[in-house]
Amino acid sequence: MKHFFAAVLIWVMATGAVKANDDVKSVISSQIDAFLQDDFVTAFDFASPMIQGMFGTPERFGNMVRNGYPMVWRPADVEFLSTDERGGALIQNVMIKDAGGKLFLLEYEMIETEKGWLINGVRVQEAGDGLA
């Protein structure tokens, strides 16, 4: 009987992890879709309270993304990679190809709030030949 409960517990935990992973991917995809429509108000809604506090308005946030993260603003291709946990935060790794064909590895730091998963920051690295 102990083995049965252990198996059920593992299944429940795995199911929760899969649901969280799907929710995280949905948030990132939805924000990218909003950027593609230049809908910075909607894109801003997917940012954490910390990020919203840093930029104050959707317009300022949109300008930052357009100028600092053009591969996110206008990606040619988006591929979700692994999900990791680091320092209590969930990290979703994403490979993005920009309009010029250059590959970038992005680490989306996600936090879970009362509103659901939100983006708390993005770290970008140009992908080398080994990551393509």
Feature map (PLM): residue ranges:
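Hydrophobic helical h-region of N-terminal Sec-dependent signal peptides
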Residues: A6-I10, A14
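Exposed beta-sheet edge and beta->alpha loop/turn motif
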Residues: S82-A132
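Residue-level detector of flexible, active-site-proximal loop/helix-junction positions
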Residues: W11, M50, E126
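Short solvent-exposed beta->alpha transition segments
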Residues: D22-S26, S30, F40-G87
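Positively charged n-region of N-terminal signal peptides that target proteins for export
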Residues: M1-F4
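Sec/Tat signal peptide C-region and signal peptidase I cleavage site
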Residues: T15-A20
